[in-house]
Amino acid sequence: MVKIHLEAINMKYRKDKYGNELSVLGYGCMRFPKKHGKIVMDIAEELLCRAVDQGINYFDTAYIYQGSEAALGEIFEKNNLRSRINIATKLPHYLIKSPQGLDKLFAEELRRLRTDYIDYYLMHMLNDIEAWQRLQDMGIEQWIAEKKAAGAIRQVGFSYHGNSDMFCRILDAYDWDFCQVQYNYLDEHSQAGRRGVEYAHSKGIPVIIMEPLRGGKLVGQLPEKARKIIADYPVQRTPAEWGLRWLWDQKEVTVVLSGMGSDFMLEENLRIAAESEVGQIPAEERDLYAQLVRAINENVKVGCTACGYCQPCPMGVDIPGAFAAYNRWHGEDKKNAFMDYLKCTTFRKNSTGAGNCIGCGKCEKHCPQNISIRQELKEVQKTLETPLYRVIKKGAGWFVHF
């Protein structure tokens, strides 16, 4: 086993809906180091054990994260850590074709994780209200109640990729224990955004943050101008520190997930967590974030601010989501841009992709940025709706209809 030596830090905690303390830094378990497509178990084990020793108690995985649930189960059992940690995993509702499928899939997750209960269970990528209604028709609310009564599930939430309007609708559709959203200083006004995060907080719903550094875009993929802004600032901090401090400054944020695949990442994030506080960012530093956002967005193809005035589209196109993915593609982050586009347009009853546009022009009448939305959506379709996209979309559509 690889040995990692970290100085002890004082982990900070924030409370969930029922007063349980969760570490402000959570461990995202989707991207463990791999070799030949398989998780390198000795490295993963050392990282996870050190994380627990340093006070991290929230570990996020999912059914579709290849090998992740099984790796966590093996490591936590081997090191007798189950009582010290909280496991969050996810129901891939888009794979469920019948009520019986709920029990079958959940049982498989318990087996993989080598446990008889899940602390935080999420509806994975619950991106529109129709998907929730489909689950309701399948008896999901009764199923959740039974699992909670039996102690097999302690809290239930959902993860989300989409606009703030739909996010708020889903929040209001059920008595959720928590939620999980993509949120960072670049996405303050896209995805669920600050509006969604603040609305969840107003309802007493804890918010778990994913993509806090935009999949590395806010660290290793910053444009030169943004890197210079950071380098020239009187207070010297790493790009990761700027990104994470922005989140922990907000009282609405409960846990920030980070996929820490090395001892360096783990050590840096632990240090930042220990030094971060709510309300710590002064006005002059907020101006730096605004400068960074402008620098990052200088080369964007579409000047969409994700205000949502163009919504709803009569054909269901997620216009802000499509443009966000398109801009990310042209920011030289093509792999994650493609995944973003898949998340916001598939795995739901009706596709919300750019290809649905019929050119009615209703959206353009309401756009405060005067974007030629119809023309730009054609470019999005041409760029992102590749043969691979169409294959995945077809498969996703089959799953959610049965």
Question: Which sequence ranges carry the predicted segments?
Answer:
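Structured C-terminal cap/extension of enzyme domains
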Residues: R50-V52, I56-N57, F76, D175, ...
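Hydrophobic faces of well-ordered beta-strands that scaffold small-molecule active sites
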Residues: S23-Y27, F59-D60, I85-T89, I118-M123, ...
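Alpha-helix-loop-beta-strand connector modules within alpha/beta enzyme cores
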Residues: A70-T89, E141-A150, S202
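Acidic, glycine-rich active-site loops and adjacent beta-strand->loop/helix elements
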Residues: L91-H93, L384
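Short beta->alpha linker loops
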Residues: Y63, G67, N127, H161-G162, ...
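N-terminal binding-site loop/beta-alpha segment at the start of enzyme catalytic domains
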Residues: V2-I85
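Glycine/proline-rich, positively charged
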Residues: K35-H36, C49, D53, I96-L213, ...
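Hydrophobic packing residues within well-ordered alpha-helices of enzyme cores
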Residues: L72-I75, M166-I170, L266-N269
